[in-house]
Regions:
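Hydrophobic "lid"/C-terminal helical patch
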Residues: 147
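N-terminal catalytic or cofactor-binding beta/alpha core of small enzyme domains
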Residues: 1-114, 118-123, 130-141, 150-157
Length: 157
């Protein structure tokens, strides 16, 4: 099972990029369903990520980043690298998807995906608003195309 989860805040411009990509994938899969592919819009609910990922073989997380890199930069990060980060506090008010990776592995063990990839797109504008900036929209289109290839490969297997 492949699970793709989009994260972000739809009311903060580029922060919505992960959710917007996930919604596009959901529209595609509504027309072209496949029983071994699930796509979720988790918004800002990190706890949902942990439960939605459970039972999957492969997990892909989509989100915006704010690292100081060039706007629109795409980072493809193996989940294992993110699990090496310091132990989170697990405060439920601050529980994010990166906490879900660590907690999910501890709680669910082998029932949590071993193969995790995180796509991050560097934001240009995180102010309140409903639009992706042009450079982030372009990067979202590139990530969407790559994910469509991954979906097609999973459909064929």
């Amino acid at each position: 099972m492949l699970t793709i989860i989009g994260c972000g805040n739809l009311n903060r411009n580029d922060d919505a990029v992960g959710v917007i990509i996930a919604q596009r994938l959901q529209q595609y899969l509504a027309q072209n369903p496949h029983p071994n592919i699930r796509v979720f819009d988790s918004g800002t609910a990190g706890m949902e990520v942990m439960f939605q990922a459970r039972g999957s073989k492969k997990l892909i997380i989509l989100d915006a980043s704010c690292t100081g890199s060039d706007a629109g930069a795409i980072f493809k990060v193996p989940g294992k690298e993110l699990e090496l980060l310091p132990e989170p506090s697990y405060n439920l008010h601050d529980f994010r998807w990166d906490h879900a990776l660590t907690a999910g592995r501890k709680i669910f063990g082998d029932d949590f995906p071993q193969d995790v990839t995180v796509y991050l797109i560097e934001a240009a504008n995180l102010d309140l608003g409903l639009e992706l900036s042009p450079v982030v929209q372009h990067s979202a289109d590139l990530v969407f195309a790559e994910l469509m290839t991954i979906i097609q490969q999973n459909v064929m297997t």
